[in-house]
């Protein structure tokens, strides 16, 4: 499953993994980046005109990763400078297009975790292009409007809104619980909170490993981080509503206010 790794873990394996920086290109070039990292800015793999939701489409994804020198069998570590939410979106996109989830890793603490203790570089990374081949995944966490609608009445399922409380109060899916994705992140370290704190926060929201979890936000960016965290914690029945509230409201799905 997709997991979260420390900067120490990455430092020990830097020559064996493909590191992907999803920050803006000017940050990659001007501020510096991890040694050997390739730049794939966030806006390059998000498109309202590609696939379902904000997925870029198979051809665009193939071209993007091939040009960045990423191979389909690479171990990939992604990072950003926004507590991991943009990097998580990259990893979930890779997962949805068939990359082996056991080879997808989020850098805990984002760029800051590495930059605090280790050297970065502004030198361009030499990239040797690949032919990235998408493999249809044996199973997918993707769920559509109809599946989410059916889940509203399922007592074994918890529907999780990962937006902030103000957004949740303005309107959310019936029966959904609010779990702001930032609640799982330590503001000081920018990484995940300790395991016992995570378990307590999740349990308080009714999110436990024995229940099916359906995630949504507005455009599937924030749920990407929550998906990666739950995967890292060993949750094995987590559904990903790519269309999220944008599609839900466009199709006149029921919304309630608090």
Model-derived segments and spans:
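Flexible, polar/low-complexity N-terminal or interdomain linker segments that lie immediately upstream
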Residues: 1-33, 108-172, 181, 255-256
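Terminal peptide-recognition signature
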Residues: 10, 37, 94, 161, ...
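Short Gly/aromatic-enriched secondary-structure transition segments
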Residues: 32-36, 40
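A short acidic, helix-capping loop that chelates divalent metal ions and anchors anionic groups
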Residues: 45-50, 185-188
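Thiolate-centered catalytic microenvironments shared by cysteine-dependent enzyme domains
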Residues: 47-50, 54-150, 204, 219-244
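Glycine/small-residue-rich hydrophobic helix-like segments
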Residues: 172-219, 225-227, 231-233
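Extended hydrophobic/aromatic segments used for targeting, binding, or gating
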Residues: 239, 248-258
């Amino acid at each position: 499953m997709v997991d979260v790794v420390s900067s120490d873990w990455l430092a020990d394996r830097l020559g064996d993994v493909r590191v992907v920086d999803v920050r803006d290109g000017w940050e990659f070039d001007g501020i510096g980046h991890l040694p050997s990292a390739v730049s794939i800015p966030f806006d390059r793999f998000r498109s309202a005109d590609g696939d379902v939701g904000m997925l870029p489409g198979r051809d665009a994804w193939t071209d993007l990763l091939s040009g960045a020198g990423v191979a389909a069998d690479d171990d990939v570590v992604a990072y950003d400078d926004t507590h991991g939410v943009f990097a998580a979106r990259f990893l979930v996109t890779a997962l949805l297009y068939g990359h082996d989830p056991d080879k997808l890793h989020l850098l805990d603490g984002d760029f800051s975790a590495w930059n605090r203790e280790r050297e970065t570089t502004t030198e361009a990374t030499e990239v040797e292009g690949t032919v990235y081949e998408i493999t249809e995944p044996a199973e997918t966490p993707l769920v559509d409007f109809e599946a989410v609608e059916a889940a509203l009445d399922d007592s074994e399922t918890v529907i999780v809104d990962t937006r902030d409380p103000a957004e949740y109060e303005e309107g959310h899916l019936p029966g959904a619980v609010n779990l702001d994705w930032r609640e799982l992140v330590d503001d000081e370290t920018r990484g995940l909170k300790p395991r016992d704190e995570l378990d307590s926060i999740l349990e308080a929201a009714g999110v436990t490993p024995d229940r099916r979890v359906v995630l949504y936000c507005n455009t599937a960016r924030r749920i990407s981080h929550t998906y990666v965290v739950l995967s890292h914690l060993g949750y094995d029945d987590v559904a990903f509503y790519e269309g999220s509230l944008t599609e839900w409201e466009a199709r006149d799905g029921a919304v309630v206010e608090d």
